[in-house]
A protein has these predicted regions:
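Signature of N-terminal electron-transfer/Fe-S-associated modules in redox systems
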Residues: 1-158
């Protein structure tokens, strides 16, 4: 059965009709052509599919599309503004915090949520925010450095 849904996607109103049981990941990738959100394991274990729902990280491979009615969804495509990378995206580039890049959208969105809640996290808080985001290439050290780099201007401002 199809559901007619209204929600905000990357800051813009969105209306869709989709089978209510389809996952948010399927709709983002297949219907809306937002392929930055990755399909990893399909079981919610790797978190490559992380998006923000009302500012909180969710595994879009587990979330039914019907859950987004009236809510705000943010994907990796919505972070850059006016052709300028989000500070976390820029920090990931500067720190070389990726190799194949498959896990990066999920990691960036998880840490965007962290920095909104806590603009000056310590290393333990960063690790906790990334818990479950699996990367088989980079070894995480540069990911931690990237999040610390993005948080640094906030720390200096305090």
């Amino acid at each position: 059965m199809n559901a007619n849904l209204q929600f905000t996607l990357n800051g813009k109103p969105q209306r869709i009709s989709a089978e209510a049981r389809r996952t948010l990941l399927e709709v983002l990738r297949e219907d809306l052509d937002l392929t930055g959100t990755k399909y990893g394991c399909g079981e919610g274990q790797c978190r490559a599919c992380t998006v923000l729902l009302d500012g909180n990280p969710v595994r879009s491979c587990l979330a039914e599309i019907s859950e987004v009615e009236g809510r705000k969804v943010e994907t990796i495509e919505g972070l850059a503004q006016n052709g300028k990378l989000h500070p976390l995206q820029e920090a990931f580039v500067q720190e070389g915090a990726m190799q194949c890049g498959y896990c990066v959208p999920g990691m960036i969105l998880a840490t965007v949520a962290l920095l909104k809640r806590n603009p000056t996290p310590d290393q333990t808080q960063i690790i906790e925010a990334l818990n479950g985001n699996i990367c088989r290439c980079c070894g995480y050290v540069n990911v931690l450095k990237a999040v610390q780099r993005a948080a640094q201007p906030r720390k200096e401002a305090q």
